Amino acid sequence: MCLHAKGQQLSCLALKEPVSIIASDRVIKKLDMSILSRVREWVRITRGSRMETSCLELALEGERQCKVGDYRAGVSFFESAIQVGTEDLQILSAIYSQLGNAYFHLREYSKALEYHRHDLNLTRTCGDELGEAKASGNLGNTLKVLGRFDEAVVCCQRHYDITRGMYDKVGQARALYNFGNVYHAKGKSICWTGAEPGEIPEEAKVALNKATEYYEFNLSIVKDLGDRPAQGRTYGNLGNTHYLLGNFQRAVVAHGQRLLIAKEFGDMAAERRAYCNLGNAYIFLGQFEVAAEHYKRTLQLAMLLTDKAVEAQACYSLGNTYTLQQDYQTAIDYHLKHLIIAQELKDRVGEGRACWSLGNAHTALGNHQKAIHFAEKHLVISKEVLVYCYWATLYSSRSNACYQYLSSSHSAFCWTSEELHGNNLLIIIQ
């Protein structure tokens, strides 16, 4: 018995439709629980084949586990559902898609890629163009994370072509957003060498400029659709991209829009990111007092959200901003706060940067004994980190193991794009 033949194809549509690429880089959109309840009720009252019911119920339980954030358990249920088997290819396609999404959340990207490929092949076999579009989007996002940008672009193009052919404006907007994310990630990967914003290789500029074009195209559609949350996400990524390109005034405009939309929805986390990003842009525009005000608002929101890592980042940024203004005593106050939080978080890289900054500030004030004290602490931490990096590099198959350790610092330099919870760029003065 095919479940999608009953209840106006309720079961397969309920499983398939929500697995769309939403306007974020987190590729899973979980199933609507009211629809799941209807599916469960349908299964309960329908006398179907035992195989179909068991497979579906295992898949539903897997979805429920993912809903509460237990993706490992979700994977177990989905894989059990596949082992039980189903004759309904659309249900199988949905399970493949959910498995790919669950593995994506677990950061097991090779497995995610495997199941999204299965889903893509199955949707093509079924002649399900809408499913193929969504599978292409999921596959593209996974390839992007793996750094396989050219392949990701092909998937995004297929996603866009299908949705355009179906006059699906929502799907087109998502495909364009994904396009922008791929080119943004490609550009960032090329210039990820500690270079100043704007001072990046030409190849990176080309990719980032393409990203801005796709984000602008996406904005034109989501504005027509009246989708304010999608507009907010795109403005955030557009601002991040302009920042990397050195277009700081444009970054301010984009992040200003992001801030307005975040306030509109009471999204304090997005509001905090927007304030931080605005502070970063104003630093490069030379408007240090304005930057400081935005960082202070970032700090206030971080404290409200009880996010100690972001609180540390904000203190570090404020310390550096006051150093630029030559207000060294205020800079010391903020760097001390950064140091205390870094110690609480056991963040040795953050501690080292705080000590370095404190040493510089005390030197500027002529407090030579304190400057020496913090310089010595910085030296001890630096040696410790270098030893760790040596062993990490020696025993790791990755050549960038040392870099990964340094960039994992809670309260030091942290960059993530809007679709992965936004940008916490810090202005590092060393």
Segment roles from a protein language model:
Residues 54-83, 101-107, 188, 199-202:
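Alpha-helical segment of the N-proximal tetratricopeptide repeat
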Residues 56-67, 91-105, 131-145, 171-185, ...:
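Conserved alpha-helical positions within TPR/SEL1-like repeat arrays
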Residues 30-47, 72-83, 118-121, 217-220:
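Repeat-mediated protein-protein interaction surfaces in helical alpha-solenoids
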Residues 65, 83-85, 103, 123, ...:
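Eukaryotic all-alpha helical interaction scaffolds
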Residues 49-50, 87, 127, 167, ...:
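Structural signature of alpha-solenoid helical repeat scaffolds
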